[in-house]
């Protein structure tokens, strides 16, 4: 969940593979998730470039806020702590706990949402596109900041005028962009941005750096973009092991993997015990539970990436003897 940049820290989750390749572990990448090989997540004991150890999901905002606060306490006002989260993390409660705390903090934290599906809220027409593009311009953010500071120093009418302009602007912007959720939490919202357009992405990130408050950057992407097997079966390529590049077929036959054997055995147990249920935190394929889900759909529960909820939910199930 952490990437150590030059003077900054980036807390990430499922972008760790790309990060490992870019930070000198290309040769070791063939040992990914193997005994004595490199980890599938960021680990500080593996590389000086890994800022923080990771788990499944939803933890990066909390970690980034801690890092941003530590930088602030040390007197560092220049650099940023960046949390990169996927839309799957939105089912995890810790994400919202972190956002709730971070949005009201006086820290240099940037949260980047990598959204693989459709837009969080449908934006309306050309005006929405224009406003979104304006908000991703660094020059706009810096000019806006200078004007606000000038109005703050203007006697008598300065602050009331600034508040009136801001309220009018927010009313129009929220009506068109529907960005109130994140801004109500205290973030400056930028986006949505096309994550496959590098120029637009760079422009948005530069604009985020120019904002002197917590920033939420909404980036839309297509999972597996450019690789047909992954685009066709994104679920099967989540946390994937080694595979044949041309076809996308795994090197290890799925039926022979530990997860598949466990999943099939669980089905046999489910036949004998009608009270047996299976619960997963958005990892049906990774845990081999797709077989159980198909055979016993009424006893299979995918609660999303919400491990705390999953454990207590299981306890509630088990309590009804």
Q: What is each PLM-predicted segment?
A:
Residues 17-24, 90-99, 121-132, 202-204, ...:
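Short acidic, glycine/serine/threonine-rich loops at helix termini
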Residues 8-9, 213, 221-320:
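Non-catalytic terminal/interface segments that mediate subunit docking, oligomerization
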Residues 1-7, 12:
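Single conserved hydrophobic/aromatic residue that forms the stacking wall/gate
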Residues 43-114, 282-321:
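Thiamine diphosphate
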Residues 16-40, 136-154:
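N-terminal structural subdomain of ketosynthase/condensing enzymes
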Residues 116-262:
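Long, well-ordered, tryptophan-enriched scaffold segments
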Residues 8-9, 79-82, 108-111, 187-190, ...:
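Beta-sheet entry/capping signal
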Residues 28-38, 104-121, 139-142, 301:
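A glycine-rich helix N-cap at a beta->alpha junction
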């Amino acid at each position: 969940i952490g990437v150590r940049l030059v003077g900054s820290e980036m807390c990430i989750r499922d972008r760790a593979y790309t990060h490992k390749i870019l930070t000198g572990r290309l040769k070791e990448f063939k040992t990914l998730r193997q005994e004595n090989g490199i980890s599938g997540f960021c680990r500080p004991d593996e590389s000086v470039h890994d800022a923080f150890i990771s788990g499944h999901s939803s933890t990066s905002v909390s970690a980034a806020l801690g890092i941003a606060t530590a930088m602030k306490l040390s007197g560092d006002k220049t650099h940023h702590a960046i949390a990169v989260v996927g839309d799957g993390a939105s089912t995890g409660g810790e994400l919202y706990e972190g956002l709730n705390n971070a949005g009201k903090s006086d820290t240099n934290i940037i949260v980047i949402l990598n959204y693989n599906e459709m837009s969080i809220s449908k934006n309306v027409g050309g005006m929405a596109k224009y406003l979104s593009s304006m908000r991703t311009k660094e020059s706009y953010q810096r000019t806006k900041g200078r004007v606000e500071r000038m109005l703050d120093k203007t006697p008598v009418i300065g602050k009331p005028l600034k508040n009136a302009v801001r309220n009018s602007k927010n009313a129009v912007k929220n009506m068109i962009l529907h960005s109130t959720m994140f801004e109500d939490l205290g973030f400056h919202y930028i986006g949505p941005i096309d994550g496959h357009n590098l120029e637009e992405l760079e422009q948005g990130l530069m604009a985020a750096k120019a904002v002197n408050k917590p920033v939420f950057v909404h980036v839309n992407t297509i999972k597996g973009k450019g690789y047909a097997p992954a685009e066709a079966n994104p679920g099967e390529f989540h946390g994937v092991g080694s595979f044949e590049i041309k076809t996308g077929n795994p090197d290890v036959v799925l039926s022979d993997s530990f997860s598949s054997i466990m999943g099939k055995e669980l089905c046999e147990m489910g036949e004998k015990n009608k009270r047996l249920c299976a619960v997963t935190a958005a990892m049906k394929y990774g845990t081999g539970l797709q077989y159980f889900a198909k055979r016993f759909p009424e006893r299979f529960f995918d609660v999303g990436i919400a491990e705390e909820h999953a454990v207590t939910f299981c306890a509630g199930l088990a309590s009804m003897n």
